[in-house]
Amino acid sequence: MSRRKPYTLYAMLVLSALWIVFFLCAPYIAPFDPETTSVADRLQDISSTHLLGTDQLGRDVWSRILYGGKASLGIAFTIIGISGAIGIVIGGLAGFSTPRVDRWLSRLIDLVLGFPNMVIAIAFVGIMGPSITNVIISLCITKWAEYARITRGLVQIERHAEYITFARMSGASNLRILWRYILPNVLPPLVIVIIQHLGDAIILVASFSLIGIGVQPPDPEWGAILLSSRDFLQTAPWLLIYPGLA
């Protein structure tokens, strides 16, 4: 039986790749060093020299947005990669194991999902101290369960397919069936979910930085940029508008 080609997945991958490459090329695109200050150029409006103006220390806003995107992507990829790997492993085991193992792992997944992610993450960072490392750990602790639940459901659907029955009849082990046959079929929808969650992770990281417990100024990260510019909403609104739109 032929499967439809995942054109939606391909389109999302291409668009996401272009967006990611754009910000990863920040060192080659940015016209200025994001950390270079110039008191004489502070709080300048849009000009041919500074496309999005300058901040309170004379730093180029466009350059800081580009470097902030690069930093935000790196942090988000770390969170999605770690939590996704944990969730896929646990979800795969839950969906393919015995009913008893599935029951216990499902309870663990439901327990984690039962608590608000932000509340747990903020509490963890509040106890451990504000740092981007603690933000990453806290979000990995809370987000893996989302991928585990999705993976479990997809694996349970695939495990009853005819080709799995034929694989069992041919003598394939459970590990080989899971790795060789099931995972390749459940990964495409998981990739779409991960791409969608990449934006969520960026917003969460920026939110932590904005309330002062994530990336700390003067590091160029979108939330940290907004945090350092919050006092200039009336005198230099571009300092918040453009990073906020990014």
What is the meaning of each model-derived region?
Residues 124-127, 154-155, 204-246:
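Glycine-rich helix-loop "coupling/hinge" segments at transmembrane-helix boundaries
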Residues 27-63, 212-213:
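Short membrane-interfacial helix/loop motifs at transmembrane-helix boundaries
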Residues 80-81, 88, 92, 130-180, ...:
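Membrane-cytosol interface at the C-terminal ends of specific transmembrane alpha-helices
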Residues 61-96, 245:
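Transmembrane alpha-helix signature in integral membrane proteins
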Residues 54-59, 96-97, 166-185, 226:
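Short helix-to-coil transition segments within interhelical loops
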Residues 1-32, 108, 187:
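N-terminal signal-anchor/first transmembrane alpha helix
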Residues 71-87, 114-122, 184, 188-205, ...:
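Hydrophobic alpha-helical transmembrane segments in multi-pass membrane proteins
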Residues 51, 55, 95-96, 101-157, ...:
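Generic hydrophobic transmembrane alpha-helix motif, especially the helices
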